[in-house]
A protein has these predicted regions:
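Short, basic, low-complexity termini and linkers enriched in Ser/Thr/Gly/Pro
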Residues: 188-205
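Juxtamembrane/disordered regions of integral membrane proteins
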Residues: 1-193
Length: 205
């Protein structure tokens, strides 16, 4: 049952990430995109994740949903600034682009996975789970942009639609796959916080 629940959650969050990615680039498909659409597109990933928890987990907290959406908006611009800063400090080569988008992906994945786990998970994530999500997000940033170059070879250093779709879909998968759970085992040094105390009624013999 636990494995089935994890699989369903992973699939659901992956689809939510895909929806978020499509919403992020949807304004590019409009002939005359409105300022509202362009302004809200950075928050699409957080909005899609919050929508998943609203519909599937029945977590109807408006505060949580609004917080995740706002964090998504801020993270979008933070990752963009960091990636742009890396490009300005490096020579214009394909390897420099990879470093820049890896850095942006790392920052975005660290913030979004930490925020999602903190708001919606019933257990605190261990450092190794956050580390996997963070490194995975960096690799997704590189892979997404490289795929974008194949379809848009003249895109240059500009983010491509493929970047957002690949990154958000992949992050949805990673968040679902490495969702923190309460495990019945002794605490390790990789735990962010100490596990909950044992039951008050341990039933000693």
């Amino acid at each position: 049952m636990a494995a089935m629940g994890r699989t369903a959650r992973t699939l659901g969050l992956t689809l939510a990430g895909l929806v978020g990615g499509l919403l992020t680039v949807s304004y590019l498909l409009q002939r005359r995109p409105s300022g509202v659409a362009m302004g809200l597109s950075p928050s699409a990933f957080g909005l899609a994740l919050a929508g998943y928890f609203w519909l599937v987990n029945r977590d109807r907290s408006i505060l949580k949903g609004a917080s995740l959406t706002a964090i998504s908006w801020a993270t979008f611009w933070l990752a963009s600034i960091i990636a742009g800063g890396e490009m300005m400090g490096l020579n214009r080569t394909s390897s420099a682009d990879a470093v820049a988008f890896f850095a942006g992906g790392v920052v975005g994945s660290l913030v979004m996975s930490t925020a999602t786990f903190s708001l919606y998970a019933n257990a605190q994530p261990t450092l190794w789970r956050l580390l996997v999500c963070t490194i995975g997000g960096g690799l997704l940033g590189v892979a997404g942009q490289q795929l974008g170059y194949l379809s848009m070879p003249h895109a240059g250093p500009n983010p491509t639609p493929a970047l957002f779709i690949v990154w958000q879909t992949g992050m949805g998968f990673l968040i679902g796959r490495f969702w923190p759970t309460i495990e019945a085992r002794e605490p390790t040094r990789l735990s962010i916080v100490e596990p909950r105390e044992k039951s008050e009624n341990p039933n000693p013999r």
